Each structure stands twice: as structure tokens, then as C-alpha cells.
């Protein structure tokens, strides 16, 4: 069966959308960062035809629903010139690759259990020249500091990885002192918040406004008492 190809879109059109979107988010990108993000969209479309990394195949929708969606959390995570970040269930590299591009001082680790997705992530590290990006394959609950990963993380992020309560249970052992868990969600997940495990609590609820996207988006910060 022939793989479906993504429709061709002029790069200038995508760049215009990216410029408009980052302005709406009050983010300033360098020319290099802007080109890296556009290259990432092109590579995601190219690999997606073979590896089915995302159900979204239109480059304009990839830019909106993947790149701008990931960029929408950046203003809320900023405040550290350096940070160790783990992206759990990263899939095609979202939001981790976007974070690594726009925050070169952060050390970003992508995690997924599917080897072909890790292979794509590793390829992106090379293609986009992201020296601050690393990839680890395996279940997040099995990752141990000093073994599979060098140390604990200041921020652990996910984008629709799992139920919020499950995400906290699986990843809390990797939170560094003073660190927290950040979960990107669509509609407000009241039931998931009610099921948060003991010793964890939502400390921030942020309603995200993703440019050009008419959909509900939220970002939750969760603190865990056993981060030590």
C-alpha cells in the first residue's frame, strides 16, 4: 500500500504563520530557531509518511496543532536559564524538540517506549543540530537516575501522554528537589485531578491560548511532596 503523502505547502506560508503565531504568544525567535522549527515540520511530514508519527498530515495543521501548541507553554515554563527537562511519551518529539530549539540552555530528554519513535527523535537531534537534546527509550516508571538518565529533572512534561493521575504516579520519582510535573491537556480534566495520588497537588492551572486553534487547552503544574 502506498503511504499517503502530506500536501505540499510553500515554506514562506508556514514561516508567515509561525511569525504571526509567535508574536501572538509574545515569543521572540532567532532566524536559526525559526528555521529549525520549519525544518522540523518538514521532517515530521517526511517521516510521518513511513512511520505514522501523527494523524495530522497537513503541514499547516502540523504547525498549528504541534508547533504553536507546544510553543504556547514556553512563557509559563520560562524563568530558568538552565534546566533539566524530561518529555514523557514524546512520540514525534512534542513538546520536547520545540523546547530544545527555543531554550538552548535547557537540557531536554525525550522518552518513549516505541523504538521507531526514538529513532526519529535521534534523527531530529542530528538533523536539527540540537546538542542539548537526548533520547532514552523505555517505560518512564523504569527509568532510574544515575542509570538510564543522568539525574533527576527540574521539569517533567507531557502532551496528552496519559491520565494525569497515572502520569504523576509513573514519573514522580524523577522529579528533582524544587522541580515539578507539567501536563498539557485539552478540556479541564476534573476527574483526573480528583484522582491525583497522595502527596501531589495541582499548584497552577493555566488556560492556554494557542494561536489559530479554536480548541480548549490547559497546562497544569503538579507538585509532589517526595521530590528529594
Curated annotation (Swiss-Prot):
Binding site for S-adenosyl-L-methionine: 89, 94, 140-141, 159
MF term (GO), any: rRNA (guanine-N7-)-methyltransferase activity
Keywords, in A-Z order: Cytoplasm, Methyltransferase, rRNA processing, S-adenosyl-L-methionine, Transferase
Tree of life domain: Bacteria
Entry-linked Pfam families: GidB
The keyword Methyltransferase appears for this protein: yes
Chief location: cytoplasm
Record EC number: 2.1.1.170
InterPro entries, A to Z: rRNA_ssu_MeTfrase_G, SAM-dependent_MTases_sf
Catalytic activity: guanosine(527) in 16S rRNA + S-adenosyl-L-methionine = N(7)-methylguanosine(527) in 16S rRNA + S-adenosyl-L-homocysteine
Role of this protein: Specifically methylates the N7 position of guanine in position 527 of 16S rRNA.
Family: Belongs to the methyltransferase superfamily. RNA methyltransferase RsmG family.
NCBIfam families cross-referenced by the UniProt entry: rsmG_gidB
Database matches in PANTHER family: S-ADENOSYL-L-METHIONINE-DEPENDENT METHYLTRANSFERASES SUPERFAMILY PROTEIN (PTHR31760:SF0)
Protein name: Ribosomal RNA small subunit methyltransferase G
Source organism of this protein record: Burkholderia cenocepacia (strain HI2424)
Primary gene name: rsmG
Amino acid at each position: 500500500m502506498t503511504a499517503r503523502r502530506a500536501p505540499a505547502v510553500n515554506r514562506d506560508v508556514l514561516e508567515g504563520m509561525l511569525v504571526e503565531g509567535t508574536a501572538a504568544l509574545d515569543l521572540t525567535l532567532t532566524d536559526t530557531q525559526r528555521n529549525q522549527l520549519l525544518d522540523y515540520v518538514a521532517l515530521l511530514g517526511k517521516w510521518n509518511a513511513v512511520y505514522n508519527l501523527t494523524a495530522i498530515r497537513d503541514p499547516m495543521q502540523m504547525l498549528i496543532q504541534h508547533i504553536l501548541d507546544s510553543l504556547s507553554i514556553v512563557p509559563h515554563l520560562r524563568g530558568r536559564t538552565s534546566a533539566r527537562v524530561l518529555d514523557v511519551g514524546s512520540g514525534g518529539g512534542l513538546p520536547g524538540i520545540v523546547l530544545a530549539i527555543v531554550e538552548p540552555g535547557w537540557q531536554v530528554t525525550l522518552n518513549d517506549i516505541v523504538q521507531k519513535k526514538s529513532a526519529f527523535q535521534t534523527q531530529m537531534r542530528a538533523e536539527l543540530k540540537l546538542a542539548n537534546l537526548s533520547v532514552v527509550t523505555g517505560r518512564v516508571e523504569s527509568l532510574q537516575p544515575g542509570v538510564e538518565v543522568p539525574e533527576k529533572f527540574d521539569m517533567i512534561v507531557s502532551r496528552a501522554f496519559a491520565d494525569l493521575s497515572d502520569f504523576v504516579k509513573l514519573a514522580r520519582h524523577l522529579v528533582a528537589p524544587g522541580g515539578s510535573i507539567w501536563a498539557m491537556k485539552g478540556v479541564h480534566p476534573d476527574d483526573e485531578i480528583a484522582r491525583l495520588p497522595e502527596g501531589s497537588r495541582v499548584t497552577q492551572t493555566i488556560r492556554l491560548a494557542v494561536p489559530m486553534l479554536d480548541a480548549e487547552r490547559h497546562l497544569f503544574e503538579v507538585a509532589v511532596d517526595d521530590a528529594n
